Amino acid sequence: MFNKDNLWTMDQIGFVFLPDSKPDTWRIIDPTTDTEVGEYYELDATVYTYADSTPDDKNEIIGAFQMFQDRPEYSVYRAHKLIHGLNTDSFSTLDDASDLYDTLIAGCAIMLYGEEYGLKRADSFLRWIRNTDFYQAPASAKYHDAFEGGLLKHSLDVAYHITDLLQLESFSTVNIASCILVALTHDLCKIGLYKPYLKNVKSEETGQWKKERAYTYNDANIPLGHGAASLYITQKFFHLSLEEALAIRWHMGRWNMCDGEVGEYHVAVKKYPLVYMLLFADQLSIKEY
């Protein structure tokens, strides 16, 4: 029996356990059985113990998606291997990371809409996103992943975590393609949101002043609010199910939520597992606020 004092809960659907014996790791707890499930999450985002190696061919994700209906456990395993070690440091260039993102988008579209139409949807989306700053943008101005390529890294990290949650019985029936698609598109509202500049920083070691890259905010391109803006963009390219749409809409949870939205949010979380999965995976990928 785990010590409940060491549990961190989100809406009483899933838990994260921080064991005293390994202070640098998290484990997921299934609240229905009070047992430990899943693998260790290293707080250093460059290391995941579930996948034993990086993929030989990133394009294998398409085959994995096509096999999902007959062998979901294989597809989940392949997704883990393909999304393993998702820190921009693990890629020689940001182009390598963007290639993986593109491949995952194509794989999701193929499974959800069929090969011919799915590839058309993916191609339309990727043509658009390549003309934005998505692959170079930070995920925040000064908190999590606040560096060039941070938004891309964060999106891939969320995809890793959300596929891991498929191992929980409560989430095992959710379509893996839906999981990865919402993970990769949940923060599209951040495109064009951060403006780079150089700021003067005093070195603690030398006492000398130097210029470092930093970010400030631009006005929101789509002033609908975080989740709603990402949903608005995603629906321009993909025909989302209600569950997929709600997952993107409510992935910020109760953060900055007005009183009138609380009831709708709780209904969405209760009825649609993917809503909670994206919220939880997003939080697992963030190390600082």
PLM features: residue spans?
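All-alpha helical catalytic cores of prenyl diphosphate-utilizing isoprenoid enzymes
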Residues: 124-131, 144-156
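Tryptophan-centered short beta-strand motifs
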Residues: 2, 47-48, 209-213
